[in-house]
Amino acid sequence: MSKKFINRKVWLLTISFLLFIQMFSQSPVGAWERYFQDENGTEIRSIVIFSERFQSIAMFNAKSGEFIYSNGGTWELNGNMMTERVEFDTANSERVGNIITFEVTITNDKLSLPESDWHFSRIDDGGPGDLNGAWLMSGRYRNGEKQMRNTDRPRKTMKILSGTRFQWIAFDTEKKEFKGTGGGTYTTVDGKYSENIEFFSRDNSRVGMSLEFNYNIEKGDWIHKGKTSKGDPLHEIWEERIK
């Protein structure tokens, strides 16, 4: 058997193996949901959003939108083992900075944590919204003046979006402090970014509000302009989070 033939056979087997892995390995990127009842029989909705490197989970009353819990940080998937570095946790700040590894199983429409017996259904896979990913607030305009901030500092305001869901979180990894969060659904149509708020940790009266903003991408930055849920003018700059 010639060396050329052997090399060709090895090459074909390698390509076939890579195609097999691609077909049967699933990505968690997108949004997932789970409904369950707490000890009082209250229905709780849990939403997880994965960007390419970051994730967040939020739990809230499925009917009233009352905020209950959130945590999040970075993630990596090796086989069926997911490793997370915790950046915020509303129930236990001492978990901030911890690295946690656990088993997950992912199919096209289900994500399960066997050890916890948690089972999530897929909402989307990162589409169709234009802004899927993790973003950090990097600046804003006040009285026409552009004011920038260092996104490498421990105090961050992050917004993580799938193709249809969003969650913003303000936190400080150095002080292990959680500042606030909110989230819901969003759309991006003809330069308009629209949010429907489903939970808001600081003020539950914001639940159910719909907000519309102008948006565009300039040199990789998300320019976000409109009014806050309080009705105040807003003109923010968000940069895509890399680290």
List the model feature ranges, each with a label.
Residues M1-A31:
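Bacterial Sec-dependent N-terminal signal peptides
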Residues G183-T187:
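Beta-propeller blade signature
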Residues F24-E76, M81-T181, K192-K243:
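Lipid interaction determinants
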